Design a protein with these regions (language model features):
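A cross-kingdom feature that marks ATP-driven nucleic-acid transaction machinery
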Residues: 1-29, 33-49, 251-252, 257-259, ...
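Residue-level preference for the first positions of well-ordered beta-strands
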Residues: 21-23, 71-74, 100
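Short glycine-rich substrate-engagement loop in P-loop NTPases that contacts/grips substrate
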Residues: 44-72
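Conserved P-loop NTPase "ATPase switch" module shared by AAA+ and STAND
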Residues: 68-84
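Conserved catalytic/switch belt of AAA+ P-loop NTPases
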Residues: 85-109, 116-117
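A short beta-strand-to-loop transition that corresponds to the Sensor-1 phosphate-sensing loop
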Residues: 104-108, 114, 129-131, 387-390
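Short regulatory helix/loop adjacent to the ATP-binding pocket of P-loop NTPases
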Residues: 109-125, 137-142
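Interdomain hinge/linker elements that couple catalytic modules in large macromolecular machines
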Residues: 138-316, 328-331
Length: 407
């Protein structure tokens, strides 16, 4: 399979010139190792902690491990050998070389606290997701997303027109590199193997889940609630477990980068706001497989198509900003009257409000609810309605209809 350029490469290389250690996190099979091997020169050692002998050496004698596998080094699945972190700290303190140690990890819940305690100030941490629609199309931008009409029009000129069939093919197929272009039979076998071989094994290693049958039911239950507010009672009922257990299990899925929780927006000046996050799958292909959508067309024409489209757009935004130069905060707005705005992009104390609609011609009156931002001392920037229109179209001076392929 031909290598697909990843948007994270630019940011990784920049941090590599600044930090001595770089950690790339993300779900299993999203391409972390492939990207780093592509970027590495021939002198960088590679070792994976999936190798039992290498892992045993790392656990029993970290000093000897680094004598055997000398830096510069790429260590895969480092969360399996947390004993290495103290020795990595020693190596960093004894060397001035940048980019000396590259790490990958796929279990955030088990690893990040140890990393931050041991390697504070020495490590840069990045997250890689499954392939975005832009990456699959070979369109990697070097400028951050800008919601002004002029910037959107400039981006539009570099891209083909928005196409609902292509969008839902991407949603159904997902972004796992190994399923790109394969037939339906192989796709189903891949996701079945992914759950059995990787996900269930990682869940078992988490130590808090022993009933894998119920956990599979819980996973399917999560897929049925995609793009909705988290409801622990409903999730618990889907697997025959207690709501408190459902809450713990959802934390595991977040830690494994399977599920993404979009936090609710909070501001002291705006009263009675929701405190419940919304649930999205990091990879829509896995979600579609769990819900047994057998073709892109049945998904596109099904009752859940709007929810999947929202999941797709939200995760494209998440990926875009995870790889961007600037730091933003993504939330959603919902008050006690069920007034909801799908996404707030908060950047430099400016809020860009966004609605998500599968329609090619949504109601422009949707943007009127953005005035809720003006009720507080908040700065409102350009926003709009992300939809299936073919080109950016102004709604008013601040908002546009935004083709989803521009995100």
């Amino acid at each position: 399979m031909e290598y697909i350029t990843r948007e994270l490469e630019r940011k990784f290389l920049k941090l590599n010139d600044f930090f001595k250690v770089i950690l790339v996190t993300g779900a299993r099979q999203v391409g972390k190792t492939t990207m780093l091997k592509h970027l590495a020169d021939s002198g960088r050692t590679y070792v994976t902690m999936d190798n039992a002998m290498a892992r045993e050496l790392a656990e029993s004698d970290p000093v000897l491990f680094f004598q055997t596998y000398k830096p510069p080094i790429l260590i895969d699945e480092v969360q399996k050998a947390p004993e290495l972190f103290e020795q990595i700290k020693v190596i960093c303190d004894e060397s001035d070389e940048k980019g000396l140690i590259w790490l990958t990890g796929s279990q955030q819940y088990k690893m990040m606290e140890r990393v931050r305690e041991t390697l504070a100030g020495r490590i840069g941490i990045l997250e890689l997701y499954s392939l975005s629609a832009r990456e699959k199309a070979g369109m990697v931008f070097d400028t951050d997303l800008d919601f002004s009409l002029a910037a959107l029009q400039a981006r539009q000129r570099k891209l083909p027109k928005n196409d609902v069939l292509q969008v839902f093919n991407h949603i159904w197929e997902g972004g796992m590199p190994q399923v790109q272009g394969v037939d339906n039979e192989l796709r189903q076998e891949y996701f079945n193997s992914y759950i059995d071989t990787y996900l269930m094994r990682d869940v078992a290693e988490a130590g808090c889940i022993t009933d894998t049958v119920r956990f599979c039911k819980f996973l399917v239950g999560c897929a049925s609630l995609v793009s909705e507010q988290v409801n622990y009672a409903t999730l618990a009922e889907s697997a025959g477990i207690a709501p408190s257990t459902a809450k713990e299990w959802l934390k595991v899925l977040v830690g494994l980068h399977i599920v993404y929780l979009l936090a609710p927006y909070f501001n002291n000046e705006l009263k009675r706001l929701s405190k419940t996050p919304k649930l999205y799958f990091c990879d829509t292909g896995l979600c579609a497989y769990l819900s047994m959508w057998l073709t892109p067309d049945t998904l596109r024409n099904g009752a859940a198509s709007g929810h999947y489209y929202e999941n797709y757009v939200v995760m494209e935004l998440v990926k875009n900003y995870a790889y961007a130069k600037s730091k933003v905060n993504l939330t959603y707005f919902r008050d006690s009257n069920a007034k909801e705005i799908d996404v707030f992009v908060e950047e430099n104390n400016v809020i860009h409000p966004l609605e998500i609609k599968k329609s090619a011609s949504p109601d422009r009156r949707e943007v009127k609810k953005y005035s809720v931002i003006d009720k507080a001392s908040l700065n409102r920037g350009n926003g709009g309605i992300i939809c299936m229109c073919e080109e950016p179209i102004p709604i008013d001076t601040d908002n546009c209809f935004i083709p989803s392929n521009l995100i």
